[in-house]
Amino acid sequence: MVTYKDSGVNIEEGYKSVKLMKDYASKTFIPGVINNLGSFAGMFEIGSGYKNPVLVSGTDGVGTKLAVAFATKKYDTVGIDCTAMCVNDILCHGAKPVFFLDYIACGKLEAEVASDLVKGVSEGCSQAGCALIGGETAEMPGFYKEGEYDLAGFAVGLVDKDKIIDGSKIEDGNVLIGIASSGIHSNGYSLVRKLITDFNEEFNGKKIGEVLLTPTKIYVKPVLKVLESFDVKGMAHITGGGFYENIPRMFKGDFTAVINKESLEIPEIFKHIMSLGVDENHAFNTFNMGIGFVICAAKEDKDGIIASLKESGEKAYEIGYVKAGGSGVCIK
């Protein structure tokens, strides 16, 4: 008799992984979660806290940062990256993340590794204040190399229709406030891995693999606090494409983001990458360069917003301004 296990799919290992994952997921449950894990679908009740609720959704993955996790055999932080990439995106439109789903794919399932991945996703959900209400683990023999996984996530948030932030209120002279990143976050790792091949190399007192695996910062709670008190005009999550691609995504009209390069506090890891042969312009077009999230606001709100972010434990400062006309980003 030929069994599913003979083809490379271990059902028992799948059951074991689900059991391990459930404990992490249940810790993220918030009011609104209706059913437990294991159903055919996750359910969430919107509730009465919104006048005209709009669902805002986003999906993303961790990319080749996973290769660093494979090489160092540290799997419990990349799940935070997965959550962060999704919730920070929907935050840009003023949405509060309410629930999350994950997707793990592999060639051969190892329950403990899958559990570590979900542990990170769960931690990210806790940081964002949303519930991990479901997911999928796909074991596909021969499709992925043994020991390799892919990880993706799906976030859904809520915002009242009249509070959607879409860039339509941005004006000439508005200020741009940058919130510091925790490091490289989750973009540019294909380039990083071309330059750095020994993850045991020492860098500032740590193994560079450990530095590269620093989780993406989740900005949800400090930014939602800002939105309670200030009229934010636009927001941008600095991901793939760096400053040049992401900051203009908040604009609806013809505007240029003028960035004061001297104001930026560029972390050592980016200076190290540039020292390996990446020119500055390319770096700003690839990495976050120390700024993971940007808020656009009126000049009179600048000090209050920065103070609020600092109260939440974030490092934030003015990095530039909006100029009417043209398009894109000018770094000078």
From Swiss-Prot:
It catalyses: 2-formamido-N(1)-(5-O-phospho-beta-D-ribosyl)acetamidine + ATP = 5-amino-1-(5-phospho-beta-D-ribosyl)imidazole + ADP + phosphate + H(+). It is found in: Cytoplasm. GO terms for cellular component: cytosol. It comes from the Bacteria. The keyword Repressor does not apply. CDD domains: PurM. InterPro entries: PurM-like_C_dom, PurM-like_C_sf, PurM-like_N, PurM-like_N_sf, PurM_cligase. Keywords: ATP-binding, Cytoplasm, Ligase, Nucleotide-binding, Purine biosynthesis. The keyword Nucleotide-binding applies. Pathway: Purine metabolism; IMP biosynthesis via de novo pathway; 5-amino-1-(5-phospho-D-ribosyl)imidazole from N(2)-formyl-N(1)-(5-phospho-D-ribosyl)glycinamide: step 2/2. Its EC number is 6.3.3.1. GO terms for molecular function: ATP binding; phosphoribosylamine-glycine ligase activity; phosphoribosylformylglycinamidine cyclo-ligase activity. Its main location: cytoplasm. One of its GO terms (biological process) is 'de novo' IMP biosynthetic process. NCBIfam families: purM. Belongs to the AIR synthase family. This is Phosphoribosylformylglycinamidine cyclo-ligase. It comes from Clostridium acetobutylicum (strain ATCC 824 / DSM 792 / JCM 1419 / IAM 19013 / LMG 5710 / NBRC 13948 / NRRL B-527 / VKM B-1787 / 2291 / W). The lineage of its organism: Bacteria, Bacillati, Bacillota, Clostridia, Eubacteriales.
